[in-house]
Swiss-Prot record:
Molecular-function GO term, any one: ubiquitin-like protein binding
Gene Ontology, cellular component aspect: ubiquitin ligase complex
Alphabetical list of InterPro entries matching this protein: DCN-prot (IPR014764), DCN1-like_PONY (IPR042460), PONY_dom (IPR005176)
Start-end of Low complexity biased regions: 8-21
Gene3D superfamilies: Cullin, PONY binding domain (1.10.238.200), EF-hand (1.10.238.10)
Domain DCUN1: from-to ranges: 75-262
Protein name in UniProt: DCN1-like protein 2
Gene Ontology biological-process annotations: protein neddylation
Segments for region (Disordered): 1-48
Length: 267
C-alpha cells in the first residue's frame, strides 16, 4: 500500500507548483515484515546418528519411536530397564547368577532351548552373560509386556524355529560363536559342543553318537567348518549311514566319526 503525505510551503496557500512540497512515498513491503522464507539449505534435515547422540534420554526415546505408540514404547522401555536392574550382577551385566534368577522367574531352565533362542534374539555375545544393550534389544524385538508373555513368546518362537530350516540354520551358526570361549570365536571346547548339539538337535539321527564320539577325541575343540558340516550331515545322511559317501567333501572328523560308528557297532 502507498500513502501520500503533502507538506505545504511556509508563506503561501498558493499554486500547485510552488505550494506543494515533495511527496514522500512510504511503502510497506510485505517482505520486510513477513516471515523470512527459508532457503532449501536451511530446511530441517533428518536427525543424524551424531545429532541423536547429543539428545537427552527422553528426546532420544521420542525420536526413536517417532510415528509409533509412544506410551506403549515408554512402557516397554521402563519394563526392560526394571527387569534388567532386578537381575543385575554388577553395574552393566547380568551374569550366571542373575540369569539363573531370571530363568527361575519366567519358569525356564538356564540350559533350555528357549533360553538359547532368547540369547539369539538378543544377539548375546557370550554364554552366561547379558549386557544391558543386548537385553533391551532382545526384549524390544519380542515386544512382551510381562514375564508370562515372554515365556509364551519364547515357547512359540522355539516351535516355529524347529520348522523353519533357514532360521534354524541361523540359530545353529550363532550357537557356535555363543558357546566359544576363545576370543577369535574359531573353536568350541568338545564337551561344550557335545552339550550344545544335544540342545539344538535332540532328535537328530547322529546327535547321540556324535556327542559320544567327540568325547573320545584327542583334540580338545571343534572348529566352525566341522560344526556347520555336522548340521548338513544330520540332514542328509541316514541314521544307518547307508547313503554316506566318504569320497564327498566332508571334513576328516566326519569320516572318522563314520568309521567309529561302524567299528563300535552303534548303528
Amino acid at each position: 500500500m502507498t500513502r501520500k503525505y503533502t507538506k505545504k510551503s511556509s508563506g503561501s496557500t498558493a499554486s500547485t507548483t510552488n505550494s506543494t512540497a515533495e511527496i514522500v512515498d512510504l511503502t510497506t513491503s510485505t517482505s520486510s515484515v513477513g516471515k523470512k522464507r527459508k532457503s532449501p539449505d536451511e530446511k530441517a534435515q533428518p536427525i543424524t546418528k551424531k545429532a541423536l547422540n547429543s539428545l537427552t534420554p527422553v528426546q532420544s526415546m521420542f525420536e526413536k519411536y517417532k510415528g509409533k505408540n509412544i506410551i506403549k514404547a515408554i512402557h516397554y522401555t521402563y519394563l526392560y530397564t526394571y527387569i534388567f536392574n532386578v537381575h543385575l550382577d554388577d553395574d552393566e551385566t547380568i551374569g550366571p547368577e542373575g540369569i539363573a534368577r531370571f530363568c527361575s522367574d519366567i519358569g525356564l531352565a538356564p540350559d533350555s532351548f528357549e533360553i538359547l533362542v532368547l540369547a539369539w534374539t538378543m544377539n548375546a555375545s557370550k554364554m552366561g552373560y547379558f549386557s544391558k544393550n543386548e537385553f533391551s534389544s532382545g526384549f524390544e524385538k519380542l515386544q512382551c509386556s510381562d514375564l508370562s508373555t515372554l515365556k509364551k513368546q519364547l515357547n512359540s518362537t522355539s516351535q516355529k524355529l524347529k520348522h523353519d530350516s533357514t532360521k534354524f540354520t541361523d540359530l545353529y551358526k550363532y550357537a557356535f560363536g555363543f558357546a566359544s570361549e576363545v576370543e577369535s570365536k574359531k573353536s568350541v571346547d568338545l564337551g561344550t559342543a557335545a552339550e550344545m548339539l544335544k540342545l539344538l538337535l535332540p532328535e537328530g539321527p547322529h546327535t547321540t553318537n556324535f556327542a559320544a564320539f567327540l568325547c573320545t577325541q584327542p583334540n580338545k575343540s571343534i572348529n566352525k567348518d566341522q560344526w556347520l558340516c555336522f548340521l548338513e550331515f544330520s540332514r542328509t545322511v541316514k541314521a544307518d549311514l547307508s547313503n554316506y559317501d566318504d569320497s564327498e567333501a566332508w571334513p576328516l572328523l566326519l569320516d572318522q566319526f563314520s568309521e567309529w560308528v561302524q567299528q563300535e557297532k552303534r548303528i
